[in-house]
Amino acid sequence: MLDTQIQELIIKWQKYLSLQKNYSNHTLISYNNDLKHFLEFMNYYNSDIVTMDYIKAADIRLMRSWLAKRKCDNFVTSSIARGLSAIKNFYKFLEKTAELHNHVVFSIKSPKKSKLLPKALSEEEVNISLDHIEEYGNSQWIEIRNKALLVLIYASGLRISEALSITKLHLQNLEFIKIMGKGSKERVIPWLAIARNLITEYLEKLPYELKDDEPIFRGKQGKKLQPPVFNRELIKLKRFYGLPEYLSAHSFRHSFASHLLENGADLRSIQELLGHKSLSTTQSYTKTSIKHLETAYVTAHPIKK
């Protein structure tokens, strides 16, 4: 499907994104899959092995056909937009390393993403989750692992990928955790006693020896715990207790921000805690909280009774 030169360039591109651009593992996997899909489509479109000549000759018709195929395959708008970003990134890399120029690819506009408000759980729903997450797990150490991880995410507002990257080295300071977030941006987060105590208990029960620089959250075989595995535990929880369908590890990060805002924290502080580059990203939580207040107002105001 691909000639040798392109295969070698893809490997170099992946190393470039990982080592020089410090892209997250999640982004690397997504970009790699997007490029693979694009090149498979190019192979089908031209009925021939993909060579540098075909890469260079990609025209508006091919690009639009590929985007249409993504839409027909039920890719959501955000995934289509990300796929286009991946292809543009690859072509930009080819400009630098292979002196290959294609202005058509860069002229394609990204589809507009619908602005979905982050969905937060109510405090009651969070408490139900924290109280019962230990019921899911086939051994005691996995049960306490699940609770420790969920409490850590909600107490600190971490992304699931950030929480799963925590090592013993992160735990040396009893008051703060230093996290390396998106774009290699470091932030400092208060280290609450409830999360610290649960993690200490979890490490005491963990049946595997870990080096100080190894991620502490492990799967049942002792390998680093992966987000889909933990989210499967949350699926069991939400189905049994009738919790919202959107409940996921990430919804507890949203809940962290929304509950802080509802309890008087200022936006700038929440922005720093979440590691948002732009304040406008954090402001979406204002809309969520206002919506929550509207619902409470309509339900509880005496004039409606």
From Swiss-Prot:
Subcellular location: Cytoplasm
Pfam families: Phage_int_SAM_1, Phage_integrase
Catalytic residues as annotated in Swiss-Prot or TrEMBL: 159, 182, 250, 253, 276, 285 (o-(3'-phospho-dna)-tyrosine intermediate)
UniProt keyword Lyase present: no
Domain of life, source organism: Bacteria
Residue ranges constituting the Core-binding (CB) domain according to the UniProt record: 4-95
Main subcellular location of this protein, as a coarse class: cytoplasm
Entry-linked InterPro entries: CB (IPR044068), DNA_brk_join_enz (IPR011010), Integrase-like_cat_sf (IPR013762), Integrase_catalytic (IPR002104), Integrase_recombinase_N (IPR010998), Integrase_SAM-like_N (IPR004107), Tyrosine_recombinase_XerC/XerD (IPR023009), Tyrosine_recombinase_XerCD (IPR050090)
Domain Tyr recombinase residues, every copy: 116-298
Entry GO terms, CC: cytoplasm
Cysteines paired by S-S bonds: none
Keyword Oxidoreductase in record: no
A GO term, aspect molecular function: DNA binding
UniProt keyword annotations, A-Z: Cell cycle, Cell division, Chromosome partition, Cytoplasm, DNA integration, DNA recombination, DNA-binding
Record-linked HAMAP family: Recomb_XerC_XerD (MF_01808)
Quaternary structure and interacting proteins, as annotated: Forms a cyclic heterotetrameric complex composed of two molecules of XerC and two molecules of XerD.
Protein task: Site-specific tyrosine recombinase, which acts by catalyzing the cutting and rejoining of the recombining DNA molecules. The XerC-XerD complex is essential to convert dimers of the bacterial chromosome into monomers to permit their segregation at cell division. It also contributes to the segregational stability of plasmids.
Family: Belongs to the 'phage' integrase family. XerC subfamily.
Name of this protein: Tyrosine recombinase XerC
Organism: Rickettsia bellii (strain RML369-C)
Phylogenetic placement of the source organism: Bacteria, Pseudomonadati, Pseudomonadota, Alphaproteobacteria, Rickettsiales
